[in-house]
């Protein structure tokens, strides 16, 4: 990805995987090695926070039941609705994704300019996000362990996790589409070694 105004090259790496598969951990490790991390979910989160700038649109789309007693959006209620209703999830994505993309582009043009950027995107291949990347990475993890990690981390039921997974491509398909694969089927040290090898490879392509 070329920044035409300065000539400095920003190398954009999209990273994905299944929910609870270790995307964030891998991203953090790569940040420690020198990458600039951008988390798509964190960018999107501000639009479903209590001070959401699109509150009216959210209520029109999902109904007033998403509001708490103070009239603020409840992210848990939003998740329960959209992950069990593919049509509403699609419409929510259509509402939020352009806003997130705009925020993302602003970061690329300012603080991330000229750097190796690791962009954590759960729906990397389900959307056109992968087309913006210089390289794509899928984290390969044990599905059952990933589900258990998500249940523990998010304090949700297994059926809620399975509902989220249903709205994503299968891990096998994400692995097929990726330029690189990070194996996360061991301990943190083995994942760190995988990241170290990947970083070295990608650094060579950036220079």
From Swiss-Prot:
<keyword id="KW-0808">Transferase</keyword>
<dbReference type="InterPro" id="IPR001977">
    <property type="entry name" value="Depp_CoAkinase"/>
</dbReference>
<keyword id="KW-0173">Coenzyme A biosynthesis</keyword>
<keyword id="KW-0963">Cytoplasm</keyword>
<dbReference type="GO" id="GO:0005524">
    <property type="term" value="F:ATP binding"/>
</dbReference>
<protein>
    <recommendedName>
        <fullName>Dephospho-CoA kinase</fullName>
        <ecNumber>2.7.1.24</ecNumber>
    </recommendedName>
</protein>
<feature type="domain" description="DPCK">
    <location>
        <begin position="12"/>
        <end position="207"/>
    </location>
</feature>
<dbReference type="GO" id="GO:0015937">
    <property type="term" value="P:coenzyme A biosynthetic process"/>
</dbReference>
<dbReference type="GO" id="GO:0004140">
    <property type="term" value="F:dephospho-CoA kinase activity"/>
</dbReference>
<comment type="pathway">
    <text>Cofactor biosynthesis; coenzyme A biosynthesis; CoA from (R)-pantothenate: step 5/5.</text>
</comment>
<comment type="function">
    <text>Catalyzes the phosphorylation of the 3'-hydroxyl group of dephosphocoenzyme A to form coenzyme A.</text>
</comment>
<feature type="binding site">
    <location>
        <begin position="20"/>
        <end position="25"/>
    </location>
    <ligand>
        <name>ATP</name>
    </ligand>
</feature>
<dbReference type="Pfam" id="PF01121">
    <property type="entry name" value="CoaE"/>
</dbReference>
<dbReference type="GO" id="GO:0005737">
    <property type="term" value="C:cytoplasm"/>
</dbReference>
<dbReference type="InterPro" id="IPR027417">
    <property type="entry name" value="P-loop_NTPase"/>
</dbReference>
<keyword id="KW-0067">ATP-binding</keyword>
<comment type="similarity">
    <text>Belongs to the CoaE family.</text>
</comment>
<keyword id="KW-0547">Nucleotide-binding</keyword>
<keyword id="KW-0418">Kinase</keyword>
């Amino acid at each position: 990805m070329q920044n035409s105004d300065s000539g400095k090259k920003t190398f954009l790496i999209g990273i994905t995987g299944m929910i609870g598969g270790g995307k964030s951990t891998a991203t953090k490790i790569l940040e420690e090695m020198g990458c600039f991390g951008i988390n798509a979910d964190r960018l999107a989160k501000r639009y479903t926070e209590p001070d959401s700038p699109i509150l009216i649109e959210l209520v029109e789309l999902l109904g007033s039941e998403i509001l708490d007693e103070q009239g603020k959006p409840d992210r848990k209620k939003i998740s329960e609705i959209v992950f069990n209703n593919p049509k509403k999830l699609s419409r929510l994505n259509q509402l939020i994704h352009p806003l997130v993309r705009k925020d993302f582009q602003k970061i690329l043009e300012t603080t991330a300019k000229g750097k190796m950027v690791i962009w954590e995107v759960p729906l990397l291949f389900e959307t056109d996000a992968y087309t913006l990347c210089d390289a794509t990475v899928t984290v390969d993890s044990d599905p059952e362990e990933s589900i258990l990690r998500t249940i523990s981390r998010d304090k949700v039921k297994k059926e809620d996790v399975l509902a989220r997974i249903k709205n994503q491509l299968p891990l096998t398909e994400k692995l097929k589409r990726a330029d690189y694969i990070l194996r996360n089927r061991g301990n943190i040290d083995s994942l760190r070694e995988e990241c170290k090898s990947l970083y070295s490879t990608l650094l060579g392509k950036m220079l």
